[in-house]
Regions:
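N-terminal cationic and glycine-rich segments that engage phosphates or anionic surfaces
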Residues: 161
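Short, structured surface patches at the beginning of a domain
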Residues: 1-157
Length: 163
């Protein structure tokens, strides 16, 4: 039996207070995942490790803790990855889809996204369906939209001499 990997992530833009040791969202993600695991007889007894990228974008996968987690996954030491929702895994539609449909199944790793109601064990030999693809697409668009809004606000502040 492999190790259960908890993956937590929060973007820099979403951090609550500068200098805070850990964001409230990371604490909430951990509590949600731990509550889910406590209610699962199948998963609650597994050895677990946590990987946390606090303040890292989800638009790419060059995140220190994600890469560390993937080293363990590739060494065949992981049985399951659990996240709060698929947007915590990433916000790049193509890459998240590649991980869910190709990489994790090839490596024999189960993926659970608690709030999305997604468990890859229910989709063996199949993808998660249109709802999973649509969620990932929305996550990607959300990130792009937020980026444009931030750039726009910064341009306004620059024109006003506040930045």
């Amino acid at each position: 039996m492999g190790i259960l990997l908890k993956y937590l992530r929060l973007s820099q833009e979403d951090l609550e207070k500068p200098g805070q040791a850990e964001s409230n969202s990371i604490t909430s993600q951990r509590a949600l995942i731990d509550h889910y695991l406590a209610g699962s007889a199948e998963l609650s007894g597994m050895e677990a490790r946590e990987f946390c990228d606090d303040g890292c974008t989800g638009t790419n996968f060059d995140r220190p803790q994600f890469q560390e987690m993937m080293r363990l996954v590739k060494s065949r030491g992981a049985a399951c990855i659990i996240v709060k929702d698929l947007s915590r895994l990433g916000r790049n539609y193509i890459e998240v889809g590649d991980y869910l449909e190709h990489i994790f199944p090839f490596l024999g790793v189960r993926v659970i996204a608690v709030n999305d109601g997604y468990d890859s064990a229910r989709f063996q030999g199949d993808t998660g369906g249109m709802d999973v693809a649509f969620r990932n697409l929305i996550n990607d668009f959300y990130s792009r939209d937020l980026s444009e809004k931030v750039k726009s606000a910064m341009r306004v502040q620059m024109r006003q001499g506040r930045l």
